[in-house]
Amino acid sequence: MVKDGIVLGKRYAVLSKIGAGGMADVYKGRDQMLNRYVAIKVLKKQYKEDENFVRKFRSEAQAAAGLMHPNIVNVYDVGEDRGLNYMVMELVEGITLKEYIERKGRLSHKETISIAIQMCSGIGAAHASGIIHRDIKPQNIIISKDGKVKVTDFGIAKAVTSNTVSTNAMGSVHYTSPEQARGGFSDQRSDI
């Protein structure tokens, strides 16, 4: 765990832990150069020696960094400092779609359509840039306090090329597409 107050890359002050995923912890931070709050995703220590995890982590940053869209969480920076691999992203104050559904229960048709349109807009922008997400699930969708829906966590995203064939099953077991589960060819349709 990263200590509060540590400064990464001589720029990003870690303020407090705000979340955790399978391979990284997420902290609220402050960009001291631009004087704004950010989210700092730090690769868990048990994975820092694993080249595959480090590559996967950097791949997320590279895949998402080129995507500038109101329905995608922006990635600002990626780096390594004191043995910590980190990614700096837009801080979205809100909750995941999973948490939102758990709190609200059944959503109205109007609300469901609004969320779906915003998700599709973000995913469509990624596809237009040649990126497939490969892990779309409620935990990777954030709803901000003002109702803006944003796609996040491009951890297993991949550039769409003729080599976008995987022999490994990727994605979350409950949400993965059949072709991904079989280790087959993944393309934009896998996100739908």
PLM region descriptions:
Residues 44-66:
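AlphaC helix of the eukaryotic protein kinase fold
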Residues 82-96, 100:
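Conserved short submotifs of the Hanks-type protein kinase catalytic core
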Residues 119-131:
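Protein kinase catalytic-loop region centered on the HRD/HxD motif
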Residues 15-21, 26:
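Protein kinase glycine-rich loop
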Residues 30-37:
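Conserved N-lobe loop of protein kinases adjacent to the ATP-binding glycine-rich P-loop
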Residues 115-116:
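Activation segment signature within eukaryotic-like protein kinase domains
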Residues 78:
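Activation-segment/catalytic-loop signature of the eukaryotic protein kinase fold
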